[in-house]
C-alpha cells in the first residue's frame, strides 16, 4: 500500500498501519529501489514482518508496490519521502526491529559527505526508534562509505558495529547483482544500539478533518481598497533557527493566482525544512464582513509543521506590506 505523507499519524503505530498483524516484527527499509530485497528477506521469517519502505524515486515506488503485491505481501507500507523525517516524526520510540539500508548513495565527491544518510545524528535517531536487540543493517560496495559509516556510528556514542556477512536477500538487489557480475565485493555491518537516547518528535500535525478547525494555520485581515495582486513577485523568507535546529525553515512564495470559485486568491508556497519539502496552497478568501481569511488549504495533503505555519505568516506579512490591516493571527 502506498501512503502519502498526510496518510500517516505523528507518531503512528504498528497497530494502525498493520491492523491484521500488529504483533509481528516491524522492519523499515531505506531506499528500497525496485523492491527486490523485501520478498527475499521476508521469506526467511516464519511470517512476513510488517514492512515500512521509504524511497525518494516515484518510479521505484510504483515498481516496488507492484512487486510486493505480486508476492502477496499485504502488510507492507511504501512511501515517497526522505528517511530522516519519516523516522523522526512517524515511527514511535522503541518500535522497530531493524532498519535496513542496502547500497545507499555514497555521495563520493569532496564536500558531499554532509548529504550521506549514515552520519552520527542518524545513528542517534535510529537508536531511539529501535527496540532492544534491534539493529541498523548496512550493505554496501563502497569501501570508503562503509568505513565512514562505522566511524560515524562510533562517534554517535550509541552504536557499535558488528561486521558480518550480508543476508543473502541483500545480494538479490539490482545493485548487488551488478557488482557481483563485475567481480566486486560488498561489505555488511550490523549497527547495534548500546544506548537508546530520547530523540523527541517534532511539532508536526495532520491536517484536521475540517478546514475550519482552529488548528489550521490562518489569519484574518482587511485588504486595502487599492490592493493590487499584480504587485506580487517571487519572495523568499527564512527563519526558525534554534540550537536544536540550526537550519530552520525556508519559505518561497512562488505564484499568486486568482480564484475562479470565490472572491479571492491562492498563493503557491514552497516550504523546506531540512530534508522535508512541501508545496502548499494558501487561500486568501473574502468573508461576509468584508475582511479576508488567509488559511492553509487542504489540497495536496499537507502536514502542519513549523515551516508551513511560517508560510501562512509570510503570506500575511506580505499582504500587510501591501497595506492590509491584520486583525488576528492564528499560526
Curated annotation (Swiss-Prot):
Annotated binding of substrate, by residue: 109, 141
Binding positions for S-adenosyl-L-methionine per the UniProt entry: 29, 55, 105
Record flagged with keyword Disulfide bond: no
Keywords from the UniProt entry: Methyltransferase, S-adenosyl-L-methionine, Transferase, tRNA processing
Catalytic site positions: 105
Record GO cellular component, one term: tRNA methyltransferase complex
InterPro entries attached to this UniProt entry: SAM-dependent_MTases_sf, tRNA_(Gua-N-7)_MeTrfase_Trmb, tRNA_methyltr_TrmB_bact
tRNA processing as UniProt keyword: yes
Pfam families: Methyltransf_4
Annotated catalysed reactions: guanosine(46) in tRNA + S-adenosyl-L-methionine = N(7)-methylguanosine(46) in tRNA + S-adenosyl-L-homocysteine
GO molecular function, one term: tRNA (guanine(46)-N7)-methyltransferase activity
Pathway the protein contributes to: tRNA modification; N(7)-methylguanine-tRNA biosynthesis
EC number per UniProt: 2.1.1.33
Free-text function comment from the UniProt entry: Catalyzes the formation of N(7)-methylguanine at position 46 (m7G46) in tRNA.
Family of this protein: Belongs to the class I-like SAM-binding methyltransferase superfamily. TrmB family.
Protein name in UniProt: tRNA (guanine-N(7)-)-methyltransferase
Organism: Deinococcus geothermalis (strain DSM 11300 / CIP 105573 / AG-3a)
Amino acid at each position: 500500500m502506498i501512503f502519502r505523507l498526510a496518510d500517516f499519524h505523528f507518531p503512528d503505530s504498528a497497530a494502525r498501519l498493520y491492523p491484521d498483524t500488529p504483533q509481528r516484527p516491524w522492519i523499515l527499509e531505506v531506499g528500497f529501489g525496485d523492491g527486490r530485497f523485501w520478498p527475499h528477506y521476508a521469506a526467511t521469517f516464519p511470517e512476513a514482518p510488517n514492512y515500512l519502505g521509504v524511497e525518494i524515486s516515484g518510479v521505484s515506488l510504483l515498481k516496488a508496490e507492484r512487486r510486493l503485491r505480486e508476492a502477496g505481501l499485504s502488510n507492507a507500507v511504501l512511501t515517497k519521502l526522505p528517511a530522516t523525517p519519516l523516522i523522526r516524526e512517524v515511527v514511535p520510540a522503541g518500535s522497530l526491529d531493524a532498519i535496513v539500508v542496502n547500497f545507499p548513495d555514497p555521495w563520493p565527491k569532496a564536500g558531499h559527505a554532509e548529504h550521506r544518510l549514515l552520519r552520527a545524528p542518524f545513528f542517534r535517531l535510529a537508536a531511539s526508534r529501535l527496540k532492544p536487540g534491534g539493529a541498523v543493517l548496512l550493505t554496501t560496495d563502497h569501501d570508503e562509505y562503509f568505513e565512514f559509516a562505522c566511524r560515524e556510528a562510533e562517534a554517535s556514542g550509541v552504536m557499535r558495529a558488528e561486521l558480518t556477512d550480508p543476508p543473502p536477500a541483500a545480494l538479490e538487489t539490482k545493485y548487488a547483482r551488478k557488482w557481483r557480475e563485475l567481480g566486486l565485493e560488498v561489505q555488511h555491518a550490523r549497527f547495534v544500539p548500546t544506548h537508546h537516547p530520547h530523540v523527541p518528535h517534532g511539532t508536526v500535525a495532520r491536517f484536521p478533518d475540517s478546514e475550519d478547525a482552529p488548528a489550521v494555520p490562518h489569519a484574518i485581515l482587511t485588504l486595502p481598497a487599492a490592493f493590487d495582486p499584480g504587485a506580487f513577485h517571487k519572495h523568499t523568507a527564512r527563519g526558525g533557527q534554534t540550537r536544536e535546529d540550526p537550519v530552520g525553515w525556508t519559505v518561497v512564495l512562488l505564484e499568486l493566482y486568482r480564484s475562479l470559485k470565490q472572491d479571492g486568491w491562492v498563493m503557491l508556497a514552497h516550504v523546506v525544512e531540512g530534508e522535508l519539502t512541501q508545496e502548499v496552497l494558501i487561500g486568501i478568501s473574502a468573508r461576509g464582513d468584508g475582511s479576508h481569511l488567509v488559511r492553509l488549504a487542504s489540497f495536496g495533503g499537507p502536514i502542519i509543521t513549523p515551516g508551513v505555519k511560517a508560510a501562512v505568516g509570510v503570506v500575511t506579512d506580505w499582504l500587510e506590506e501591501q497595506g492590509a490591516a491584520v486583525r488576528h493571527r492564528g499560526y
